Amino acid sequence: FLMTYGDGLSNINLNKLLQTHNQKKKLATVTAVPPIPRFGAVRVSNNLVNKFNEKPKENKNLINGGFFILETKLFKKINLKKNVMWEQEPMIKLTKKKQLAAYIHKGFWYPMDTERDQNYLNELLKKNAPWLKK
């Protein structure tokens, strides 16, 4: 089944997400996305800044994009406790058991965690909402 946090907008191709999940044959697949360049990057050595990059566009790290495909049998396999945060104990257990695959999405993804995010996404909606493009 599909699961999402519901606090992000994206043009994720759900068919490709499902295809990756089926190919990897794991209990869960997470959508991995590049982080948005919201903050500047600071490289520090011996308490001295040796590089500063304001809102870098390139970041080789990926973050949890909040869109998942889960097998129903995973609830029996990883013994989940009640009232646990999905991105903590369950995802850590799945990772340790090598049962968490990743679908890498390089298209549009943006969180809506703050009023600032909401305002930005509303402006995009008025112009040309990239999450509505095929």
Model-derived segments and their meaning:
Residues 14-16, 25:
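Nucleotide and nucleotide-moiety/phosphate-recognizing core
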